[in-house]
Amino acid sequence: MALYSWVQRGWRCGQTWAPLLGGGYRELSATQARQLLGRRFNLLLQQKCGFRKAPRKVEPRRSDTGSSGEAYKRSALIPPLEETVFYPSPYPVRTLLKPFFFTVGFTGCAFGSAAIWQYESLKSRVQSYFDGIKADWLDSIRPQKEGNLRKEINKWWNSLSDGQRTVTGIIAANALVFCLWRVPSLHRTMIRYFTSNPASKVLCSPMLLSTFSHFSLFHMAANMYVLWSFSTSIVNILGQEQFVAVYLSAGVISNFVSYVCKVATGRYGPSLGASGAIMTVLAAVCTKIPEGRLAIIFLPVFTFTAGNALKAIIAMDTAGMILGWKFFDHAAHLGGALFGIWYITYGHELIWKNREPLVKIWHEIRTNGPKKGGGSK
């Protein structure tokens, strides 16, 4: 989820954030915060904002305690704590200008690319239909060479719905980024580009990249489970190409809403996770099918309508944003949910059904192309 994480300026005991089982984030001690930056940590012997005695001839500093009680030095590959502290701009409103234009530009490019992708998909389906007839004839006259494993993989893949096939790529991207977090030498890069924070020097690219970023395995698993569960419904409603455009745009838009809230309240801090985009998917499905029945994974006996679930989620995130709850990035959740509701209600008619001019231009480019000698057709 797009959740508050790690180090805040002027950190004290209980001012740092890290993953909490259940998909959320909780307050951790100073010692635990350093573990996120690549330092060794022992859960049984953790310190709670305490100082260890300074070693001889070494400047006093905070240190973690290993299982043997010795202090471990910070690796040279991991940035010192001071380099990960974020300093807000003295002009907070100006900070939002670049993210705003990036959000508008990226959203436009996402839907434009999706329209062209759909056009190319339709053309390729026609061609693949005739190629399939030829391939079936060739397969019937020559022996099969596929192994059992390949047959099982093909059988599993063909059993998936269009939505499940689509989100498989998204899940794979999230898993790859999760693995990168496990490499200590990449922590500096991951914090800079895969966590979104309006106080960071890099503002725009993390708005997209942080949508695929999870530090906690449980956090990623919970998000991907929800995405997988709603994938068939959302792709049936929007189609594969439109869904991808909505999902990517939702990640950027929800992060921009988070930026606005952080700047307005002065509560800066890095966020990461796919929750903003997933909230858009959930809100879109619940708005389109409000009478659908939903259940909690561990409490399948208790069911409720999709419409009521959406209202409860919006109410909780609104309260969390107003009251300053810090377990989740409630502003990003709320921004994603409102975007999903708006898109199903108005955005589909306003954006997707007006894509024809762009598709016609692309068709002309593909059909005519540049002519030699500058002649026209």
Swiss-Prot record:
It is a multi-pass membrane protein. It catalyses: Cleaves type-1 transmembrane domains using a catalytic dyad composed of serine and histidine that are contributed by different transmembrane domains. Signal peptide: none annotated. Residues 117-165, 236-242, 290-293, 353-377 are mitochondrial intermembrane. GO terms for cellular component: mitochondrial inner membrane; mitochondrion; nucleus. The chain crosses the membrane at residues 96-116, 166-186, 215-235, 243-263, 269-289, 294-314, 332-352. Residues 51-95, 187-214, 264-268, 315-331 are mitochondrial matrix. One of its GO terms (molecular function) is endopeptidase activity. It is found in: Mitochondrion inner membrane. The modification Phosphoserine is found at residues 63, 68. It is an enzyme of class 3 (hydrolase). Its EC number is 3.4.21.105. It comes from the Eukaryota. P-beta is proteolytically processed (beta-cleavage) in a PARL-dependent manner. Keywords: Hydrolase, Membrane, Mitochondrion, Mitochondrion inner membrane, Nucleus, Phosphoprotein, Protease, Serine protease, Transit peptide, Transmembrane, Transmembrane helix. Residues 1-50 form a transit peptide. The active site is at 275 (nucleophile), 333. The keyword Transit peptide applies. GO terms for biological process: membrane protein proteolysis; mitochondrial fusion; negative regulation of intrinsic apoptotic signaling pathway; negative regulation of release of cytochrome c from mitochondria; neuron differentiation; protein processing; proteolysis; regulation of mitochondrion organization. Belongs to the peptidase S54 family. Interacts with PSEN1 and PSEN2. Binds OPA1. Required for the control of apoptosis during postnatal growth. Essential for proteolytic processing of an antiapoptotic form of OPA1 which prevents the release of mitochondrial cytochrome c in response to intrinsic apoptotic signals. Required for the maturation of PINK1 into its 52kDa mature form after its cleavage by mitochondrial-processing peptidase (MPP). Promotes cleavage of serine/threonine-protein phosphatase PGAM5 in damaged mitochondria in response to loss of mitochondrial membrane potential. This is Presenilin-associated rhomboid-like protein, mitochondrial.
